[in-house]
């Protein structure tokens, strides 16, 4: 389902009609209680009013979906041009990708860490690159199909290897990828953005 300006207006009409219906079906006592305090009103929205609206629209109900870790904005106007989500648990980074896809800044960035290198012998499981990169790309593709956007998703993956094959030094890498506005993985860039071999000797 692709959203256009017309279909977005239709969604708004359905949303407001459902809100009106739920409010009409709410007893006066419950409305009075909800307006007793800010906290009660928030509970009313969260528990009574909005979940039934989501169900009627055939949508999944979620709370506190968007809270962005970092933003880089234009001076004065403070319009964000870059949003960054940092996730230390790479297995849960799909949530950050979903969140970033909901934002309209030109550049959205996932910054995460994990056992990434697919080179044989580096990681016993063979590295997470192929699996997770495809997963994140599929999330972007689903969003593009529903709501085309000119924004891109940058992916930065930090990787620390404690012991490389045949040596005891440490290696820190950052891998970089770009998933473009059509959800295609760009090949016009260097995969390894940064690499440093760090000798074990001298580290405290």
Name the predicted role of every residue range.
Residues 1-64:
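Acidic-basic catalytic patches of nuclease active cores, encompassing PD-(D/E)XK
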Residues 52-64, 107-110, 138, 144:
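Charged, terminal alpha-helix-loop-beta segments
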Residues 59, 66-74:
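Long amphipathic alpha-helical segments with strong coiled-coil/leucine-zipper propensity
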Residues 65-67, 79-81, 105:
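Short connector loops at helix/strand junctions that flank enzyme active sites
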Residues 70-72, 78-88, 100:
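Conserved catalytic cores of phosphodiester-cleaving nucleases, focusing on short active-site segments
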Residues 84, 109, 154-156:
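Hydrophobic/aromatic beta-strand patches that form the interior of the parallel beta-sheet core
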Residues 87-143:
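Catalytic cores of nucleic-acid endonucleases
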Residues 138-204:
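Non-catalytic C-terminal interaction segments of nucleic acid-processing enzymes
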